[in-house]
A protein has these predicted regions:
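Active-site donor-binding loop signature of nucleotide-sugar glycosyltransferases
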Residues: 7, 48-50, 67
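Mid-to-C-terminal alpha-helical segments outside catalytic/metal-binding sites
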Residues: 58-86
Length: 86
C-alpha cells in the first residue's frame, strides 16, 4: 500500500530519503521551492488546505519548475490515477 506524506515541507534530501523507501510526498504553497523543483515528475503530488486554491499551488509548481500550467495539471492527474490505480 503506498504512503503519501501530507503537507510535506522538508527539503530535497528528506524527500529523496522518503522516495527511496517508497514513500511519496504531497506539496502545497508552503513547500520548499527547491523540493518542488526537484521532485521527479512521476512523483509530483500537490495539495491545498484552508483558503488556498489548487490553482495557486499549480501555478507555484509551474513557475518553480519552469513548466506550463497544463503540464503540471496533466502530471497531477496522471500521478493521482496511478496512485489510485484508476
Amino acid at each position: 500500500q503506498p504512503w503519501l506524506v501530507h503537507g510535506f515541507r522538508g527539503g530535497p534530501v528528506q524527500m529523496a530519503q522518503l522516495h527511496s523507501n517508497g514513500i511519496l510526498v504531497s506539496l502545497g504553497l508552503k513547500a520548499d521551492p527547491l523540493t518542488i523543483k526537484q521532485v521527479p515528475q512521476e512523483r509530483l503530488f500537490l495539495e491545498t488546505d484552508g483558503n488556498t486554491l489548487i490553482s495557486q499551488v499549480i501555478e507555484l509548481a509551474a513557475t518553480v519548475r519552469n513548466e506550463s500550467i497544463s503540464t503540471i495539471q496533466n502530471l497531477i492527474i496522471r500521478n493521482n490515477r496511478n496512485l489510485l490505480s484508476l
